[in-house]
Amino acid sequence: MSQQLQQIIDTAWENRAELSPKAAPADVREAVAHAIEQLDKGLLRVAEKKDGDWVVNQWLKKAVLLSFRLEDNAPMPAGGYSQFYDKVPSKFASYTAEDFAAGGFRVVPPAIARRGSFIAKNVVLMPSYTNIGAYVDEGTMVDTWATVGSCAQIGKNVHLSGGVGIGGVLEPLQANPVIIEDNCFIGARSEVVEGVIVEENSVISMGVYLGQSTKIYDRETGEVTYGRIPAGSVVVAGNLPSKDGTHSLYCAVIVKKVDARTRAKVGLNELLRGD
């Protein structure tokens, strides 16, 4: 079924200029709607780990973008205090008490998750925003004013602190989603964007900004890398001097590495304060 869906969506993508809310073949509408439904239920994912590597299902990103072409904007009620005007309804627009109980997560007002995002059991959504295509796995806390961007992949038992920004990735289409693996802590007001991967059991301090052009300096080895935080890293904001010594530029500094056992036993503040 997924292979057939992919073929229909890939073909529709090549002919997307011809599509509109009033002009789209029935099979394309059905395929896109089914793909969004599967994303919403967590049965399909924009990215998944296979044999230790993350694989991106680009066709599902295409399905999300096609859904924007196939839907008109429409008024959406917002509990009596306002209205929205958009193409994508709230994930919870038609939820009953039984649906919430079956989902097993908490949604604190006025948290918003768009339809096509997946929220797993024991997730807590404080007043926050989760975009279409995102996957938020079990036991994760999305704290107040945090944003989970389109198609971002958030692992199990992750803490996204207040004001954290996890970047979206629908445009440009070839870009990979941001991935935060299991048991990570992302400190307040930090930003992870442009397909950066934060591997499992890592701790990102408050106010760390990570994009593909951000230098990641390993204090232990002196190595500079880009785009990936290794498993078990403790990361703080820092600066590296220019070659001529006239100025310094922002970087992220890996100050130490810890294993899962140490991570579980030692408090976050102690990890971040240690020399």
Curated annotation (Swiss-Prot):
Pathway: Amino-acid biosynthesis; L-lysine biosynthesis via DAP pathway; LL-2,6-diaminopimelate from (S)-tetrahydrodipicolinate (succinylase route): step 1/3. InterPro entries: DapD_Trfase_Hexpep_rpt_fam (IPR005664), Hexapep (IPR001451), Hexapep_transf_CS (IPR018357), THP_succinylTrfase_dom1 (IPR023180), THP_succinylTrfase_N_sf (IPR037133), Trimer_LpxA-like_sf (IPR011004). Keywords: Acyltransferase, Amino-acid biosynthesis, Cytoplasm, Diaminopimelate biosynthesis, Lysine biosynthesis, Repeat, Transferase. Coiled coil: none annotated. SUPFAM superfamilies: Trimeric LpxA-like enzymes. CDD domains: LbH_THP_succinylT. Substrate binds at residues 106, 143. Its EC number is 2.3.1.117. GO terms for biological process: diaminopimelate biosynthetic process; lysine biosynthetic process via diaminopimelate. It is an enzyme of class 2 (transferase). It holds the Pfam family Hexapep_2. It is found in: Cytoplasm. Belongs to the transferase hexapeptide repeat family. Homotrimer. HAMAP family: DapD. NCBIfam families: dapD, PRK11830.1. This is 2,3,4,5-tetrahydropyridine-2,6-dicarboxylate N-succinyltransferase. It comes from Paraburkholderia xenovorans (strain LB400). The gene is dapD.
